Amino acid sequence: MAGSSIGQLFKVTTFGESHGAAIGCIVDGIPPNLEICEADLQHDLDRRRPGQSRYTTMRQEKDQVKILSGVFEGKTTGSSIGLMIENTDQRSKDYSEIKDLFRPGHADYTYHQKFGHRDYRGGGRSSARETAMRVAAGAIAKKYLNEQFGIVIRGYLSQLGDIKADSIDLDEVENNPFFFPDLSKITQLEDYMKALIKEGNSVGAKVTVVASSVPVGLGEPVFDRLDAELAHSLMSINAVKGVEIGDGFAAVSQKGTEHRDEMTPGGFLSNHAGGILGGISTGQDIIAHIALKPTSSLTIPGRTITTNGEATTMITKGRHDPCVGIRAVPIAEAQMAITLLDHLLRHRAQNLHVTTNTPFIK
C-alpha cells in the first residue's frame, strides 16, 4: 500500500488499523528546537477522540499519544518524530458477521478487489481511526506555524444535514459538542441528532477550515498549486466527497465583476478566491470547505453481496458516528496545517531571497 505518506519537506507517514494493537506515524522534516511535548498533541486528539458525546461513536479510546523519538529534553532534534497510540477498546466480535460480505458504501469491496486480502474488523486500514495520527502530526505543524509565523488555523461544522450556520462566532465552536459556530442552532441540532439516532440512520455534513496570517507566496505552480495540494490533502480524509476553496462552486453563478477580488493600496476588497490566486497564497485568509457523506454503517437493513457474489442483506453492528462530520473538524485543521507547513518549508528553501518593490497587502 503505497499511499500512506503526504508531503515533501514536511512529510507524514501513518500506519496501523482500526482493530490492530496500535496506530502510529512518522513525522519527517520538522525543524529542530521546537518545544513540544505530548500534552501539546493531546489537546487536538481529545477534540477528535470518540465517545465524548451521545452524538458520536461510543467507542471509548483515550487516544493517549506517545512520543517515541525525535524529541529530547522537550525540543525537537530535527530527526524523525515517531508517534504511537495504543488501541484499547476494540470489539472485533461486532464484525465477525461481515467477514464474508461487503458493507454497502464502505471500502470493503474495493479493498478486497484491489488487495485480495482485507482486515474486515472495523474497516482495517480504511477506518477513520487512522486519522488520529494525522491530528497528532497536525498538532506539531500547527504549533510550529503559530510560533514561527503567527498562523492560526480554525475549523468548524458549518452545516449538518439541512441545518446551516446563519452566523459565525468562533468563540462558540469549542462550547458545544458539534463544533458549531451558531449558538442559536444547537437545540435544533440536538433534536435532529436524537431523532436520527433513534431512526438508526446517518447524515452528511460540511466543515469549514480557515487559516489566518498565512504569508503571500506559498504554492508551487503548476501541478503543486497550493489549492491543488490542499484539495488533495483534504480529500484524503475519510468520507470527504467534495472540496471547495473560497466560494468554490458558488462561482458558477457569479459574474466576473462580483468574483474578482479587487485590490487597493489598503488591501483586497473581497476574498472570493479563498486566499489563493494562481495557485499561490495572497496573504488573505485561506478558506476551504469539505463535504462529508453520511456514513453507511446503519442499523437499517441494506442490500449487498457476499465475497462469492451472492445477493444478501445486512445491518451494521458495532459503534459508529451518526454524522462523521462532527469529529472531522480537528482532522481538517490538521490536514490544512500539514500542507501549509510543507509549502512554507518549500517556499523558504527556494524563494527566501526573493524581494520585490511592491508592498504586501491583505
From Swiss-Prot:
Names of required cofactors: FMNH2
Residue numbers binding NADP(+): 48, 54
Pfam families membership: Chorismate_synt
Alphabetical UniProt keywords: Amino-acid biosynthesis, Aromatic amino acid biosynthesis, FAD, Flavoprotein, FMN, Lyase, NADP
GO CC entries: cytosol
Binding site for FMN: 125-127, 238-239, 278, 293-297, 319
Pathway connected to this protein: Metabolic intermediate biosynthesis; chorismate biosynthesis; chorismate from D-erythrose 4-phosphate and phosphoenolpyruvate: step 7/7
InterPro entries linked: Chorismate_synth, Chorismate_synth_AroC_sf, Chorismate_synthase_CS
Coiled coil: none
GO molecular function: chorismate synthase activity; FMN binding
Top-level taxon: Bacteria
Purpose: This reaction introduces a second double bond into the aromatic ring system.
Name of this chain's protein: Chorismate synthase
Source organism (scientific name): Psychromonas ingrahamii (strain DSM 17664 / CCUG 51855 / 37)
Gene: aroC
